[in-house]
């Protein structure tokens, strides 16, 4: 299990949002720390194949992630900073909807959804409408949906944004629990989000990595 960034750059005109990033990651939790505008989200969107790098390569076990296509996306779980959901769906129905998008068979999806909702402390809220949930609850459902396909790579972009201190602690504990046997990349501008759970912390500033 190895993820490699090789001279990865994303340029918008003369601005380098990500600037020649080179790094290797294996199993564990990696904290990507930086202020808003440092390039974290751009890097994560490339990692999730939402946008292409201007130059450089991102490799999974030695193969370019963009050439791997659907097989790569099948081992990827992603929680964006602002993820969309249908407010009138129940928590359970939302999970089943995402499971169908990810191609899970209904019998597998049902078991997986119920297990994950239990794991994130949302089983008792599974019949509640998404629009009735607090910010912390929405983030917990968010990480549950990202885990539906049992991903090898879990990407969390500013997962504690807008949460109170108690919810941040709960979320950190959850990330630690879910990190076994997978690679977790967690981006944040809050030091405490990563200092207790990350195996390695990388500072990102003006599109570059600092160690």
Where are these predicted regions, by residue range?
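Walker A (P-loop) phosphate-binding loop of ABC-type ATPase nucleotide-binding domains
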Residues: 35-39
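Conserved ABC ATPase "signature" region
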Residues: 96, 100, 107-125
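Catalytic Walker B motif of ABC-type/P-loop ATPase nucleotide-binding domains
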Residues: 154-157
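Conserved ABC transporter NBD signature motif
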Residues: 56-67, 71-72
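Conserved ABC ATPase signature
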Residues: 129-133
């Amino acid at each position: 299990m190895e993820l490699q960034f090789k001279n990865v750059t994303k340029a918008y005109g003369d601005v380098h949002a990500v600037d020649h990033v080179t790094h290797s990651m294996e199993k564990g939790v990696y904290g990507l720390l930086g202020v808003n505008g440092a390039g974290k989200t751009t890097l994560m969107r490339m990692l999730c194949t939402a946008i292409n790098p201007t130059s450089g390569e991102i490799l999974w076990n030695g193969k370019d992630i963009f050439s791997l296509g659907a097989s790569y996306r099948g081992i990827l779980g992603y929680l964006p900073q602002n993820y969309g959901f249908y407010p009138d769906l129940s928590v359970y129905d939302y999970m089943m909807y995402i499971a169908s998008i990810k191609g899970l068979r209904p019998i597998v999806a049902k078991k997986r959804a119920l297990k994950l909702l239990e794991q994130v402390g949302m089983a008792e809220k599974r019949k509640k409408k998404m629009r009735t949930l607090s910010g912390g609850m929405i983030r917990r459902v968010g990480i549950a949906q990202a885990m539906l396909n049992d991903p090898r790579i879990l990407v969390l972009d500013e997962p504690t944004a807008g949460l109170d201190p108690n919810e941040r602690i709960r979320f950190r504990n959850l990330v630690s629990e879910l990190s076994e046997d997978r690679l977790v990349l967690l981006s944040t501008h809050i030091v405490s989000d990563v200092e207790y759970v990350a195996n390695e912390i990388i500072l990102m500033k003006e599109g570059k990595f600092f160690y």
